[in-house]
């Protein structure tokens, strides 16, 4: 018979493995063996055990007023299948399948891999999964909670009572599991976790949940992602063979909650179905090649943009807190946490067929003293400031992603001079495919924010990035970070009057697309947002009724089209062979010119930029050969709300040596304008 201490610990939910007490057991009593079935049914007035097949009933005795029942079956020593017959306070009877009648589900091999930190498909094992066990349909729950003394599954199905569905811990792994019969997709649940720390009790969302409630609610939802049937095999195979380093990449960065809203319905967000029908056609029409979605996992604070998550952080505040952002830091050095993070990355690739992943704030991971004062951080074992655990995690993440999913990109937002971020790990790099060029972004925005009269003193801000442009596989970015927190929108950063602001912005975009490196625009830049980005409201699409904004949008579309169609603008982004200065030394007039070349050097474009509002007539630049040079883009065209200063569609090269080249073009340069020429 059950001991009083055991009963009390079940009733007060203080037993780490309830299967040791609850369910069916062969017991010894008085020197003889019997079968005992025990159940904790807080809402039952009476209970009985019903044998499957024979239908034979065995009454259960209440051993505790809170609902602990036991049936000791004399004359039987066999473990048999049964159901629990429960009679509630209203005398209503129901037949239930005992969740404590099932054997463990996670295999020893699964547990070994989880403990080792190499179970990279954890999302198929941990979390909530519909399954059939011994012919019984239900949901299997599993979670890693190493510092818990008890974990329970709670939900509407048990009135959020953490005593009813206590989970079993699997040895010393810290993994808790339970199969609950009768549950199915759509069930709302949480884990109730009792901590070793003073018995602290907390409700937690499932870190492996496939679906979550909308804030302010925070429960997880059982969902079966495998019900969706993919039809993209052709793309998935083609992706493996795609050389993204030589392909056009013009990325449109999107925050789905504020790209567009429905004002007629209280400013609600668009659904994913609505986004598929509106965002995808828009991006394709604008000529962008990729979309970068800011974090899409459900999050309780809209203003966090989806970055602020919790769980599995360092216990040491010298490692586990990022004070600048008020966020906690994952415990990179623990194998199970590193496994969780890598498995999470693979989840998006496996279940959602995502084509790339960007890792945010990599610098804060790499450096132990990142934004910390002396005394606020602990050196590594060599006395340095490098976070060796984070470095190891990043390298392993990249190796596994690239190994399992050829053709998938990994991108680092890394703001320091850490070397070889986008170089393979076997060459000593971190293994990312590409890296955001934060230095270029800072320099270029500082330059464009200057009044043109002072730009001649700061031309190095335009040209300095070319000194290190080929040390990494860079993406040139104008991201969300530059249009928030008082930094102003891109258009509002531009100096000058109304016309000059638009001219400067077109010039900025032109210079960006002409430089080596892939490209990224944050949403709203293409229509000339006046206000900073606000995650709680839509972009100002109404601006497109005004000519300057509509024509700016048309310019970005044409710029994207040119970028995609001209190999010289994207084939050789990461080596010096694709770029050649014509002249960067005309500081006095703030003019620069250069050549971009394709893999075939004979395929090239000539770029000329005038960064002042002064028209320059008869301005000569050297070119590699004679013939006619067609003007394929003019940012000052009347089509884009410019002054329409140009070169009548192109110019013939003169046999006049200039800039150490055999021929030259005599050009009229528009104010705050960019010109692009292609030889016939």
Q: Language model features by range: what are they?
A:
Residues 215-216, 353-355, 370-536, 564-621, ...:
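Conserved alpha/beta catalytic core and glycan-binding cleft of carbohydrate-active enzymes
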Residues 312, 330, 380, 490-494, ...:
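Glycine- and acidic
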């Amino acid at each position: 018979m059950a001991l009083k201490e055991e009963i009390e610990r079940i009733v007060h939910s203080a037993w780490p493995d309830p299967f040791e007490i609850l369910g069916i057991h062969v017991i010894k009593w008085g020197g003889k063996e019997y079968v005992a079935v025990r159940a904790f049914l807080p809402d039952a007035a009476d209970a009985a055990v019903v044998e499957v097949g024979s239908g034979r009933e065995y009454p259960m005795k209440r051993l505790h007023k809170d609902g602990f029942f036991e049936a000791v079956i004399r004359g039987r020593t066999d473990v048999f299948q049964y159901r629990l017959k429960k009679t509630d306070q209203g005398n209503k009877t129901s037949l239930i399948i005992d969740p404590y009648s099932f054997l463990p589900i996670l295999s020893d091999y699964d547990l070994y891999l989880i403990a080792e930190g190499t179970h990279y498909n954890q999302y198929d094992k941990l979390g909530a999964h519909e399954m059939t066990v011994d012919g019984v349909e239900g949901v299997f729950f599993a979670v890693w909670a190493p510092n818990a003394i008890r974990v329970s599954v709670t939900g509407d199905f048990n009135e959020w009572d953490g005593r009813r569905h206590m989970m079993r811990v699997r040895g010393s792994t810290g993994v808790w599991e339970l199969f609950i019969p009768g549950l199915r997709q759509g069930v709302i649940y949480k884990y109730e976790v009792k901590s070793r720390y003073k018995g602290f009790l907390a409700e937690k969302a499932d870190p492996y949940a496939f679906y979550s409630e909308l804030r302010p609610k925070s429960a997880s939802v059982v969902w079966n992602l495998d019900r969706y049937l993919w039809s993209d095999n052709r793309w998935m195979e083609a992706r493996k063979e795609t050389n993204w380093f030589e392909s056009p990449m013009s990325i449109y960065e999107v925050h789905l909650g504020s790209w567009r809203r429905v004002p007629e319905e209280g400013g609600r967000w668009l659904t994913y179905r609505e986004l598929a029908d509106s965002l995808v056609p828009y991006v394709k029409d604008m000529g962008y090649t990729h979309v970068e979605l800011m974090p899409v996992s459900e999050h309780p604070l809209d203003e966090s943009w989806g970055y602020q998550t919790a769980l599995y952080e360092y216990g040491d505040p010298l490692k586990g807190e990022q004070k600048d952002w008020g966020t906690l830091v994952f415990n990179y050095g623990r194998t199970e946490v590193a496994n969780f993070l890598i498995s999470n990355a693979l989840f998006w690739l496996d279940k959602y067929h995502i084509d790339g992943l960007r890792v945010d704030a990599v610098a804060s991971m790499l450096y132990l003293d990142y934004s910390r004062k002396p005394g606020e951080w602990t050196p590594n074992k060599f006395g340095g400031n490098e976070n060796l655990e984070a470095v190891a995690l990043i390298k392993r993440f990249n190796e596994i992603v690239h190994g399992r999913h050829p053709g998938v990109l990994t991108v680092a937002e890394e703001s320091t001079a850490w070397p070889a971020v986008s170089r393979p790990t076997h060459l000593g790099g971190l293994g990312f495919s590409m890296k955001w060029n934060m230095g270029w972004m800072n320099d270029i925005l500082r330059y464009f924010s200057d009044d043109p009269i002072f730009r001649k003193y700061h031309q190095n801000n335009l040209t300095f990035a070319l000194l290190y442009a080929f040390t990494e596989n860079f993406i040139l970015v104008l991201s969300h970070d530059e249009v928030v927190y008082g930094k102003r929108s891109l258009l509002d950063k531009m100096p000058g009057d109304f016309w000059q602001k638009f001219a400067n912005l077109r010039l900025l975009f032109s210079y960006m697309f002409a430089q080596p490196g892939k490209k990224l625009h944050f949403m709203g830049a293409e229509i000339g947002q006046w206000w900073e980005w606000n995650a709680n409201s839509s972009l100002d699409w109404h601006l497109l009724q005004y000519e300057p904004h509509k024509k700016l949008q048309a310019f970005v579309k044409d710029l994207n089209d040119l970028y995609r169609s001209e190999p010289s603008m994207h084939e050789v982004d990461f080596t010096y062979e694709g770029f050649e200065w014509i002249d960067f030394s005309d500081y006095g007039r703030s003019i620069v010119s250069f050549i971009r070349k394709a893999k075939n050097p004979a395929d090239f474009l000539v770029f000329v930029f005038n960064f002042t509002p002064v028209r320059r007539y008869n301005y000569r630049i050297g070119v590699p050969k004679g013939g006619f040079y067609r003007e394929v883009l003019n940012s000052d065209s009347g089509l884009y709300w410019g002054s329409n200063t140009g070169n009548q569609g192109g110019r013939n090269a003169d046999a006049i040596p200039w800039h150490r080249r055999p021929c030259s073009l005599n050009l009229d340069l528009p104010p705050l304008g960019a010109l692009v020429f292609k030889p016939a």
